[in-house]
């Protein structure tokens, strides 16, 4: 198993657009071998003193944090999928 994780700032007003894009991308990833894709929206992200999710992505006021991950059977499948997705015109 190989897991890729992502932390993304998304303007609150763009949530529906993000979900549409993530759904489309999720289908493409699944077509190339991803076994699970999770999009988790911020509900209770605390501000840290040294670092936190907001600082990690330089989130602006009005942006929500999305923590997502993709599970692949192995790194080789993820690497091959990345190359194919870069050529996929969907």
What is the meaning of each model-derived region?
Residues 1-67, 71-88:
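Short S/T/G/P-rich N-terminal loop/turn motif that feeds into the first structured element of a domain
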């Amino acid at each position: 198993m190989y897991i890729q994780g992502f932390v993304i700032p998304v303007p609150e007003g763009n949530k529906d657009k993000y979900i549409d894009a993530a759904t489309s991308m999720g289908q493409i990833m699944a077509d190339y071998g991803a076994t699970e894709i999770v999009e988790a929206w911020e509900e209770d992200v605390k501000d840290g003193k040294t670092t936190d999710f907001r600082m990690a992505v330089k989130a602006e006021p009005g942006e929500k944090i999305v923590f997502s991950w993709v599970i692949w059977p192995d790194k080789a499948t993820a690497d091959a999928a990345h190359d194919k997705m870069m050529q996929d015109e969907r």
